[in-house]
Amino acid sequence: MKSIAIIGASGYTGAQVTSLIQADDQLKIQGLYVSENSLDKGKTLASLYPVYSHIDLSLAPLTEQAKQAIVNEADAVVLATDHGVSLHLAAWFYQAGLAVFDLSGAYRFADSEQYPKWYGFEHIYPEVLAEAVYGLAEWNTEAIAASKMIAVPGCYPTASLTALKPLKDLMTDSLPVINAVSGVTGAGRKAQLHTSFCEVSLTPYGVLGHRHQPEIATQLGQQVIFTPHLGNFKRGILATITVQMKPGVSEADIAKAYEVYESAPLVNVYHNQFPKVDDVVHTPNCLLGWKYDPLNGYLVVASAIDNLMKGAASQAHQCIKIHFNY
């Protein structure tokens, strides 16, 4: 049984990953941690989230003594923390010998020059960054198993790449157009006016400047036009993607490409049928639906995931299972 420490456990993603690890009989929780100045330190997880009343664990401050206890007692650490925090913690725990599953964007780009532009910091751990692998579970199994530094993908990239990667050899060089809508949990637990119930309405944000655009483009190997939207619902993502296919591509070719997911139990593909957010909420699944116009050569594919599950916590759990081979 592997022991897992969870840092940032008071947030939506941290609480969700805690529940998944607690329910896994191959894993045990070494401890739940929050920052030393967190207002949640000392509280139980159940007091913050009554839905997790069966998890009788308190949120401990991440002191230097706590970090050393994690190194001594845990096999791996999950970081459900901001990229500015994960940058340092991931390197520290990795260099101490633990497997690290980082849910932030601090290690998703192999190219260190991307970080000042998209995340606002210089990456100061090149030796750790060089070992990081991108934890897109259905596609990078061998790398996830071999590395102790796993950068769990973002929510929008997970939805988009799951839809697009099988099509890479069938697409033209024309940029795929991705319009994606996420529930407000994607903005985190901290109170903000623009994500409060009375303020939320369907609206685009981060237009032509969202940091998930280069993440998608890097992993796809092709530039994309990505426009995220905030939806007036709690959780879930629906990405609707338009792709120009190469001349001569048929429906049979597309169906054949998506057969790559026949051995992937969490990804289901439908032809001429499209998913809705409610189909995936509170599940680790990704549902894809596609339709092709052979006359004009355009494919529309919709991808639905739960942003807190497949887009974060359950994909981290997948990566843990892959890494520890069970």
UniProtKB/Swiss-Prot annotation:
Location in the cell: Cytoplasm
Record's signal peptide: none
Catalytic residues in the record: C155
GO BP: L-arginine biosynthetic process
Enzyme Commission number(s) from the entry: 1.2.1.38
One Pfam family here: Semialdhyde_dh
GO MF term set: N-acetyl-gamma-glutamyl-phosphate reductase activity; NAD binding; NADP+ binding
Keyword DNA-binding: no
Enzyme's top EC category: oxidoreductase
SUPFAM superfamilies for the chain: Glyceraldehyde-3-phosphate dehydrogenase-like, C-terminal domain, NAD(P)-binding Rossmann-fold domains
CDD domains: AGPR_1_C (cd23934), AGPR_1_N (cd17895)
Reactions listed under catalytic activity: N-acetyl-L-glutamate 5-semialdehyde + phosphate + NADP(+) = N-acetyl-L-glutamyl 5-phosphate + NADPH + H(+)
Keywords, alphabetical: Amino-acid biosynthesis, Arginine biosynthesis, Cytoplasm, NADP, Oxidoreductase
Gene Ontology cellular component terms for the protein in this record: cytoplasm
Pathway linked to the protein: Amino-acid biosynthesis; L-arginine biosynthesis; N(2)-acetyl-L-ornithine from L-glutamate: step 3/4
UniProt similarity note: Belongs to the NAGSA dehydrogenase family. Type 1 subfamily.
Function: Catalyzes the NADPH-dependent reduction of N-acetyl-5-glutamyl phosphate to yield N-acetyl-L-glutamate 5-semialdehyde.
Protein name: N-acetyl-gamma-glutamyl-phosphate reductase
Organism: Shewanella loihica (strain ATCC BAA-1088 / PV-4)
